[in-house]
Regions:
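Core catalytic alpha/beta fold that binds nucleotide/phospho-ligands
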Residues: 1-133
């Protein structure tokens, strides 16, 4: 049974301005350690790819927090959410810390879809209760 759906759209220009002013603080607040490493690799290759990566992770985490129904607070820390990609490039969510425990206690499977243009990144997240029987 679906327990929540969340959506977030972020303008790349907005994230670009934040990164210009507060790159280190923003990235350390938003990205997990593995995502931070990926961000720097992508940015080194092409600054636009780094920007799109940071924006898509922000959108994904906001969308997930909406699907969970809590927003970003208490046990939901941005750095405890990682967006990974499978071998075909499809994104999926990995949780750590208290958030991992919360998602397990709630019996949830959570899914994410990302899309972007040259101006915006968007994410849609769905949480559903696992069928245990």
């Amino acid at each position: 049974m679906i327990t929540g759906i969340g959506c977030d759209v972020v303008e790349l220009e907005r994230i670009e301005k934040v990164l210009q002013r507060h790159e280190k603080a923003f990235l350390e607040k938003v990205l997990s350690s593995s995502e931070l490493e990926t961000y720097h690799k992508r940015k080194a290759g092409n600054s636009k790819r780094g920007l799109a990566f940071a924006a898509s992770r922000w959108a994904a985490k906001e969308a997930f927090s909406k699907a969970l129904g809590t927003g970003i607070r208490d046990q939901v820390r941005l750095t405890d959410i990682s967006v990974k990609n499978n071998e075909l490039g499809a994104p999926y969510l990995v949780f750590s810390g208290e958030l991992k425990e919360l998602v397990q206690e709630m019996g949830l499977d959570c899914f994410i879809s990302l899309s972007d243009t040259d101006k915006v990144c968007m994410a849609v997240a769905v949480c559903e209760r696992k069928n245990n029987g």
